[in-house]
Amino acid sequence: MLGEQKEIQEVKNAYEAYEKINEIDPYDIEELKHIHGIMTKYLIDESGCFRHGEEGVFNGEECIFMAPPARFVPHLMEELFDWMEREKEEVHPLILSCVFHYEFVFIHPFTDGNGRMARLWHTAILAKWNPIFESGTPHSHYFSDELGVPIFFANLCDKM
């Protein structure tokens, strides 16, 4: 295989995590930590645990975003998951998954893997709503071979 060992491990971990997407309960915070443990296995010491230190996003030397202090992370994550559980029947899954993604990335609960986990969890929320987002679903049958028209999305728009 070509590539750095860390990159190869990231791909293996992501594959393993996405294989579980159909089994994930996206409203369970402990499951989020468990899947993070899979996503970051052999890559970081705090795999599967919320961060204990401060975290920011940097562009070279410049800090472009500073996450909330680590001491607030458990409470912020509980609030986010409580909100999702409470609103999952009232808020459309497309909106719910986007709000989750935004809030999750803002909270930045882990030392590493936040972007990967946000994308995976976003997909897990959507997979509970529609099978097109499930792992292993052949997406080709959602499209018209004759016209190249995205049938699934046209039907979705008709229902909204």
Regions found by a protein language model. Give the residues of each.
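FIC/Doc superfamily catalytic core
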Residues: 1-160
